[in-house]
Amino acid sequence: MSHKSAEMYELKKKVEELKKIRGRATELVSLYIPADYDLNKVMQQLREEYGTAQNIKSKTTRKNVLGALERAMQHLKLYRQTPETGLALFVGNVSEQEGVSDIRVFAIVPPEPLNVRLYRCDQTFVTEPLEEMLRVKDAYGLITVEKNEATIGILRGKKIEVIEDLTSNVPGKTRAGGQSARRYERIREQEAHEFMKRIGEHASSVFLPLLEKDELKGIIIGGPGPTKEEFVEGEYLHHELRKRILGVVDISYHGEYGLRELVEKASDILREHEAVKERKLVQQFFKHLVKDTGLITYGEKEVRKALELGAVDILLLSEGYDRVRVKALCNNCGWEELKTMTEAEFELYKKNLKACPKCNSQNISVEKWDVAEELIKIAEEGGAEVEIISLDTEEGQQFYKAFGGIAAILRYKLQ
C-alpha cells in the first residue's frame, strides 16, 4: 500500500471517531484552512468569534465555546504557516458527563489539498469535506450481454455495484422452414437489434455522467457467446464510451455473479486495480495457511511480535478492525496495565476502573490509541508493506470474520 493509501485509511478512522462525538449544545468548533491561506487572518476571525461567544446566554455553553476557541488559537500558534495540503481543526468538549469539561483538539493535515475555508460552531463536527476525499472516485463500467438479458454495473474501489438488470423479448430459434422461417428470423433480428439499442441507451445514462466527472476509467464487456462482440461491433454504445472499452471477455454467468466473474476474468486488464490485488493477497494468505508453510501469522499479539522482530513482509489489516490499545497507570504507586480491546469494551473498562487494584488509590490516568495506526507505523519503519483489506469482497469478509481482520505474511519462519 502506498503512503497515501495509509494516510487515507488513517483519515477514515479519524473521521469515524469525529462523527461519533455529540455536543450538548452548539459548542463544537470545526475549522477548515486551505493550503497557503494566511494563518493571521484565521487567528483574527477566531478572536472575533471569541468576542461574539461571550454573549451566549447559557453559562455552560458559553464556557465550552470559549474554551474551544482558546484551544484552537493555542494550537494554531504551533504552525509557522499552513501545512502544504491545508489544515482541519476540530475542537470541543467531548465529555459525556454533564458539568464536566474535557476540551480536546483534533488536528488533521489531509492527504489531499483542502479547497474549502470554513468555520462552524455546531452540535456536531463538520466532516463532509474530509468524507469527500475518502470517496473512491475512479470507476470502471461493467456490462454483461446475452441474447435475452444484460446487466450493467460499476466497479468502484473494491465494490461491485449492480446498477440494472435488463431482459428482452427476443424469441428463440424456430424449426419452421420457407418464408415463415425467414420472416420469423427477421423479427428475431429486429428484436435483438432493439434490445442492443436499449442496453446502449441504459449504459449511456449510467456511464456518461461518470465520464463528464472524469471518474470513468474504462469499460469491460463480457458474455457467454458472440452477442457481446455483436454489441461492440454494432456500435450500440455512445461513441465517447466506445473509446473507453478496455476489453471484451468470455464469461459463463449473468447478473451479479456475471459481474464478479467479469472482474475476475479481466484481471489482466485490471492488474493494478485494488479489487484484483486484494483478492490475490487474501488468496496468498489462505494458500500459506492450507499448506502450513509457517510464513503467516494472525492475531494482534502474534502480528505485533512479528513486526517487532522485523519478520513481516506484508501486514494485512481489515478496514473493519477497530481495536484500541489501553494503558492504565496509577499515579500513586506506579501500577500499570496494558490491554487491547474494542471501543465498546474501553468505555466499560473506564467505568469499572474506580481504584488501583494494588494501593486502592483513585488517582489513575487512562490513555488509549488506535492499534491499526500503531501497527502501520511499526510496519512502515520496518520496511514492511501494508495492505488494507476491505469488507466489500467475499474474501475480505472471510478474512475479517475468520481471522479477526489482522494477519501478516512473513519474510521467514519464526521459531
UniProtKB/Swiss-Prot annotation:
One of its GO terms (cellular component) is cytoplasm. The keyword Cytoplasm applies. Its main location: cytoplasm. Pfam families: eRF1_1, eRF1_2, eRF1_3. SUPFAM superfamilies: L30e-like, N-terminal domain of eukaryotic peptide chain release factor subunit 1, ERF1, Translational machinery components. One of its GO terms (molecular function) is translation release factor activity, codon specific. Gene3D superfamilies: 3.30.1330.30, eRF1 domain 1 (3.30.960.10), eRF1 domain 2 (3.30.420.60). It is found in: Cytoplasm. Keywords: Cytoplasm, Protein biosynthesis. InterPro entries: eFR1_2_sf (IPR042226), eRF1_1_Pelota (IPR005140), eRF1_1_sf (IPR024049), eRF1_2 (IPR005141), eRF1_3 (IPR005142), Peptide_chain-rel_aRF1 (IPR020918), Peptide_chain-rel_eRF1/aRF1 (IPR004403), Ribosomal_eL30-like_sf (IPR029064). It comes from the Archaea. HAMAP family: Rel_fact_arch_1. Heterodimer of two subunits, one of which binds GTP. Directs the termination of nascent peptide synthesis (translation) in response to the termination codons UAA, UAG and UGA. Belongs to the eukaryotic release factor 1 family. This is Peptide chain release factor subunit 1.
